[in-house]
A protein has these predicted regions:
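N-terminal Sec/SRP start-transfer signal
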Residues: 1-42, 461-483, 525-573, 814-817, ...
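Membrane transport/envelope proteins' first extracytoplasmic loop
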Residues: 1-358, 497-510, 523, 592-601, ...
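C-terminal transmembrane helical bundles of large multi-pass transporters
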Residues: 740-742, 766-865, 869-879, 887-905, ...
Length: 924
C-alpha cells in the first residue's frame, strides 16, 4: 500500500503564506496589534491584580499595627521550679519556651511571622516615696528577641544577679536553730534606666527605689546603669514603651505617669522571686513578617490563627503547658479577604469582556481577510487544492502573527508588572486560539462551500423546506443564547458572582454581561428589518435619492451579527466600567458617612462639658451627644439582635443633614412623646417583626416599650438599629445612662474637637475624622488597582469598539462601492455618496450604542448586590448605583467619531475614482 503523499499538501505553502501576508500587510498588522494588546491586558491584568492584592494585604496588616500581632501569654509558673524560689536559669527557660512556641505553630502561620519577642512585665507598682504631684507607677520589665540590637550602657553596668534573700533567710534561721528571730531583708533587684527616666525621677547609678504594691515581701530596685537602645524604633520595644521613657497620660487629678525599670537576664530571676504569681505577665509576641505575607497565603494564615485561638491546646510546650492566645490577625485578614473577593469579581467581568471583544474583533479581521482573498482562494480550490491545504496555508500565516503578538504582549506585561508573580496564561491562550484558527476556519469554510455542488432545489416546495430548516436551526441557536443569558443573570442574582462551589469566580457567571449583550444583539437583529422598513417608507415620501438608498443598503446588509455583537459588548462594558468606577468612588464616601455618622466622631468618656466646649469653637455647626448599646435583643429572647442608638434627635438631625446627602429627615419629631413609649426608628429589616409584635427592649429587669414611628436607612454598625431620642428614652427608664458618643459637624470640626479636648482636659477618648477615614480607604492598594483597571479597560474597550467599526466599514466597502459607482453615473455627487455611507452604517452604530448603554446600566442595576460592590466600597448597607454622563459620553463619542472618520476616509479613497473609468468598466 502506497503511503499518502504529503508534499502536494504543503509544497510552497510557507512561501505563499509569506507573500500573502506581505500583500495584506495592513490587515495583518491590525491582527498583530489586536493580539498584542489583548495579550498584554490578559497577562498584565491578573498579575497587576495579584501584586496589588499582595500590597493590599501588607497594607492592611501594617495599618492594623499591634492588632495584627499574635500574643501568647505564658502561665505564671512557666520557667520556675517552685513558686517563690529563685531560679537562676529563668531567662534561658523563657527564651527556650518562646522559640518552642514558634516551632509548634501551624505551618502557614509559622512561615508568616517573625522571630518571637519575649516580654516579662510586672503589674503597676507604686513608689515607696512617690513624687509630690501626679500619679506614678513603676513596671519592672525585660524584653528579648534574637533579632534585637540590644542596648548600650552609657553609664554604670548591666544589672546582675542579687543574693536570694529568702534562701539566706532560711539558712540563717536554720543556723539559729529556728528560735532566734531573723530579719527578712528586702529583695534586691538590679535594674537599668534610660537617661529620660533618670532625669524625671532624679536617679543615678546606685540609687535605690523602694517598691510597693503587688510584691511578695519588701523589695528594692537598685539602679546599676543607664542605657540607651541601639535602635529605639525596632519592634522589640513596641510592647513596653515605658522602658525607654516615661509614658504620661493626662488626668484631672494630675498627670498619670508610668515608667519602666529594665531587667537583665541575670536580674529577672530576682524580680520573679519578689513578685507573686498574679504580679507579672510573660507574653510572647509574634509580629507578622509583612514582606513574607501574600494574598494567596492570607486565607491559610487566617485559618491557622482562628484554629489556635479557638483551641490553644494545639500549642503544647515542653512539660505539657499551654498558652492563652489572643490576636486580631484573623479579623484583619478576613476583612481584607472580603474586599479582595469583591475586587476579584469586578476584575473577572472586565477580563472576560476584554477577551470576548478581542476575540470578536479578530473574527471580524479574519473574515475581512478571507473576503479580500475570496477570488484567489476559490481559484486555488478550482485548480485542485484540497480544503486542508488551503487551511494549512492560512494557518502558516496566522500562527507566526499570533506568536509574535503573544511575545510582544508578554514582554510588555512583564515590563509593566515586574515581579515574581506567576503568569496566568488562560485568557491569553483563549485569544491566541481564536487568532490562530479564525482565518483558517473561515477560509476552509469558504472554499468548501464554493465547490460542494450543493444548490437549492428548483422546486419551490422543496426549496422552502430547506430554507425553513435553516431558519429553524438559526432560531434554535438564537433562543439558546437568550436562554443562556437569562439563566446566567438569574444565577448571578441568586448565587452571587463569588458564591459558587468553586474556589474563585465562575467564568460562566463572569460572562453574564457578554451573554446579555449577545441576547440584546439577537433582539436588535430581529427588530432591524421592521425598523429599517419603516425608515425606508418614510424616506420614500421625501424628495431625494439618498434616504431611500441608505435605508435599502442598511436593510440588505448581511453579516451584521458579529459586528453588532462586538460593538454592543464593547460599549456595554465601557458604560459598565465607568459606572462601576463612579459607584466605587461615591460608595467609599457613603461608607465613611455610615461608619462615622458625622465629620468627627468622638467615643469614650465624653461629657456635656466637652460637647458645650466643642460648640463654642469656630468651625463647628452642630454637635450631638448620645450612646450606642450593642447586642440588645428586640422583644426579648428569640428576637433580633439590634444596636440601640440613643441620641439627641434634634441636634443629630442637623449633624446628619450636613454630612449625608441621602438623609431623608426621618429624625424630625423623634423627641416628642409617643403613644406607648419613646418614639423610635428601626431598620427596614425589623419592620416585619415590629408590625406584628411591637417593639420593646429590656434595661436590666425593666421593660421599655417603644413606639415605632418609621424606619431609617442610617447604620451604626453591622447590626440592625433601633434609634431613639436620648432624652425621651432616659425619662422612660430608671437605669442611668452615660453618654459615650459625640457627633460633630462643620468645616473646622477636627481642629475644634482637638482644641476642646485640651480645654476641658478630657481623657480616654477615641477621635475619628471622617475625611481621614475616607482618605485611608481611597489609598487602599487593592481598591486603587481596581479603579485603575476600570479606567484602562474603558479606554481599551473604546479602542476595540472603534477598530470593530472600522473593520465593518472596510468589509462592507466593496459592495457599497459598486452601488455608489452605479449611482454616480446617475448623478450622485460626492456629498450624496458620503451621506449614503453614513446612512447605511448609522443604524448599526445607533443600535449598538443603545443596546450597549442599556446592558451597561442593566448589569449593575439588576445585579448590584450579586456583583459584590459593597465589599469593595466598605458600605454597611446596600450599594446604590451612581449614574454619571461621562461613560455614556465616551461610548457615544467613540462610536460617532469612528463612524465619521471611516466615512470621510472612504470618501477620500473613492475621490480618486474617475467617472470615465466607472462608465467604461461598469461593475467595480
Amino acid at each position: 500500500m502506497r503511503a499518502p503523499r504529503v508534499l502536494p499538501l504543503v509544497a510552497g505553502s510557507p512561501l505563499l503564506a509569506r507573500r500573502r501576508a506581505i500583500a495584506d500587510r495592513g490587515l495583518v498588522a491590525v491582527c498583530l496589534a489586536l493580539v498584542a494588546v489583548t495579550a498584554f491586558l490578559a497577562l498584565a491584568g491578573p498579575r497587576y491584580l495579584v501584586e496589588s492584592a499582595d500590597r493590599g494585604v501588607r497594607q492592611a496588616v501594617t495599618e492594623a499595627g499591634s492588632r495584627g500581632d499574635v500574643l501568647a501569654e505564658m502561665p505564671p509558673a512557666m520557667g520556675t521550679v517552685r513558686e517563690g524560689v529563685r531560679d537562676p536559669r529563668l531567662a534561658d527557660k523563657l527564651e527556650s519556651a518562646a522559640n518552642d512556641l514558634r516551632a509548634v505553630l501551624p505551618d502557614e502561620l509559622r512561615a508568616t511571622v517573625q522571630e518571637p519577642v519575649l516580654s516579662f512585665q510586672s503589674t503597676d507598682l507604686s513608689l515607696a516615696a512617690p513624687p509630690e504631684t501626679g500619679l506614678w507607677a513603676l513596671r519592672l520589665g525585660w524584653v528579648w528577641s534574637e533579632r534585637s540590637a540590644g542596648v548600650r550602657w552609657v553609664e554604670g553596668a548591666e544589672p546582675g544577679a542579687s543574693p536570694d534573700v529568702r534562701a539566706e533567710y532560711a539558712a540563717e534561721r536554720e543556723a539559729a536553730g529556728y528560735d532566734a528571730p531573723v530579719e527578712l531583708r528586702p529583695q534586691r533587684v538590679e535594674v537599668g534606666v534610660t537617661r529620660a527616666t533618670a532625669d524625671v525621677l532624679g536617679l543615678s547609678v546606685g540609687s535605690e527605689i523602694g517598691l510597693a504594691g503587688a510584691v511578695r515581701d519588701e523589695a528594692v530596685a537598685v539602679v546599676t546603669g543607664i542605657f540607651q537602645p541601639v535602635d529605639a524604633a525596632e519592634d522589640t520595644w513596641a510592647g513596653a514603651p515605658e522602658l525607654l521613657e516615661p509614658v504620661v497620660r493626662q488626668a484631672k487629678r494630675g498627670d498619670h505617669t508610668t515608667t519602666g525599670l529594665l531587667l537583665s537576664r541575670e536580674s529577672i530571676a530576682d524580680a520573679r522571686s519578689a513578685l507573686p504569681a498574679s504580679g507579672h505577665r510573660t507574653i510572647v509576641r509574634l509580629a507578622v513578617d509583612v514582606p513574607a505575607l501574600t494574598a494567596a497565603r492570607a486565607g491559610a494564615v487566617a485559618d491557622d490563627v482562628a484554629s489556635i485561638t479557638a483551641n490553644p491546646e494545639q500549642l503544647v510546650l515542653s512539660g505539657g503547658r499551654t498558652l492563652a492566645v489572643s490576636t486580631g490577625l484573623d479579623e484583619v485578614l478576613g476583612e481584607f479577604a472580603t474586599r479582595l473577593r469583591g475586587v476579584t469579581a469586578q476584575a473577572s467581568l472586565l477580563l472576560v469582556g476584554i477577551v470576548t471583544v478581542a476575540g470578536l474583533a479578530l473574527v471580524l479581521a479574519a473574515r475581512l481577510l478571507v473576503t479580500r482573498r475570496r477570488t484567489l482562494l476559490e481559484a486555488e480550490r478550482a485548480r485542485g487544492a484540497s480544503v486542508a491545504s488551503v487551511a494549512l496555508r492560512l494557518l502558516l500565516e496566522s500562527v507566526p502573527v499570533t506568536l509574535v503578538g503573544l511575545v510582544l504582549g508578554l514582554v510588555a506585561a512583564l515590563l509593566a508588572t515586574p515581579g515574581p508573580t506567576a503568569v496566568v496564561w488562560g485568557p491569553a491562550i483563549a485569544v491566541a486560539v481564536v487568532a490562530v484558527l479564525a482565518t483558517p476556519v473561515l477560509g476552509a469554510a469558504l472554499v468548501a462551500r464554493a465547490w460542494t455542488g450543493r444548490q437549492l432545489p428548483a422546486n419551490r416546495q422543496d426549496r422552502e423546506r430547506v430554507l425553513g430548516r435553516r431558519r429553524a436551526q438559526r432560531r434554535t441557536a438564537e433562543v439558546t443564547v437568550v436562554v443562556l443569558a437569562a439563566g446566567a443573570a438569574s444565577a448571578v442574582r441568586g448565587r452571587g458572582l463569588l458564591q459558587t462551589q468553586t474556589s474563585g469566580v465562575d467564568l460562566l457567571l463572569a460572562a453574564t454581561p457578554a451573554l446579555l449583550a449577545a441576547g440584546a444583539t439577537i433582539l436588535v437583529l430581529r427588530a432591524f428589518p421592521v425598523v429599517l422598513g419603516a425608515i425606508g417608507r418614510l424616506a420614500a415620501r421625501r424628495r431625494g435619492l439618498v434616504g431611500v438608498v441608505a435605508a435599502a443598503r442598511a436593510a440588505q446588509a448581511a453579516g451584521l451579527g458579529v459586528p453588532l455583537l462586538s460593538l454592543t459588548v464593547a460599549l456595554a462594558l465601557v458604560v459598565f466600567a465607568g459606572l462601576t468606577a463612579a459607584t466605587v468612588g461615591v460608595g467609599q464616601e457613603r461608607a465613611s458617612i455610615e461608619q462615622v455618622g458625622a465629620d468627627v466622631l468622638v467615643e469614650g468618656g465624653v461629657t456635656r462639658e466637652l460637647a458645650d466646649e466643642v460648640l463654642r469653637q469656630d468651625g463647628v455647626d452642630s454637635a450631638a451627644l448620645g450612646t450606642t448599646i450593642g447586642t440588645r435583643r428586640l422583644n426579648g429572647d428569640g428576637g433580633e439582635v439590634v444596636t440601640l442608638v440613643l441620641l439627641e434627635a434634634a441636634a443629630y438631625e442637623r449633624v446628619r443633614a450636613a454630612v449625608d446627602p441621602r438623609y431623608g429627615g426621618e429624625l424630625a419629631g423623634l423627641d416628642g412623646a409617643g403613644t406607648d413609649g419613646p418614639r423610635v426608628l428601626v431598620s427596614p429589616s425589623l419592620r416585619a417583626e415590629t408590625d406584628v409584635a411591637g417593639a420593646r427592649v429590656y434595661d436590666g429587669e425593666q421593660r421599655v416599650v417603644l413606639d415605632v414611628v418609621g424606619d431609617t436607612t442610617m447604620t451604626f454598625g453591622p447590626e440592625p438599629v433601633v434609634v431613639a431620642d436620648l432624652g425621651t428614652y432616659t425619662a422612660a427608664t430608671e437605669v442611668p445612662l452615660a453618654e459615650d458618643t459625640l457627633w460633630v459637624s462643620g468645616p473646622g470640626a477636627p481642629a475644634a474637637v482637638e482644641r476642646a479636648i485640651v480645654e476641658v482636659e478630657a481623657v480616654d477618648l477615641d477621635v475619628t475624622v471622617r475625611a481621614d477615614r475616607l482618605a485611608s480607604e481611597r489609598s487602599s492598594a487593592l481598591v486603587r488597582a481596581l479603579q485603575q483597571l476600570l479606567l484602562l479597560t474603558s479606554l481599551v474597550l473604546a479602542m476595540f469598539a472603534a477598530v470593530t467599526l472600522v473593520l465593518t466599514v472596510v468589509a462592507t466597502a466593496p459592495e457599497r462601492g459598486r452601488t455608489l459607482s452605479a449611482l454616480r453615473t446617475l448623478g450622485l455627487d460626492a456629498r450624496g455618496a458620503r451621506l449614503v455611507t453614513l446612512g447605511e452604517l448609522s443604524p448599526l452604530v445607533v443600535a449598538a450604542v443603545l443596546a450597549g448603554a442599556l446592558i451597561g446600566v442593566a448589569v449593575p442595576v439588576v445585579l448590584t448586590s450579586a456583583l459584590g460592590l459593597r465589599r469593595v466600597t466598605g458600605e454597611l448597607g446596600t450599594t446604590e448605583l451612581v449614574v454619571t454622563p461621562l461613560p455614556f459620553a465616551l461610548a457615544v463619542g467613540v462610536a460617532v467619531l469612528a463612524l465619521l472618520v471611516s466615512v470621510v476616509a472612504e470618501a477620500a479613497v473613492r475621490r480618486r475614482d474617475r467617472l470615465g473609468d466607472v462608465l467604461r468598466v461598469g461593475d467595480r
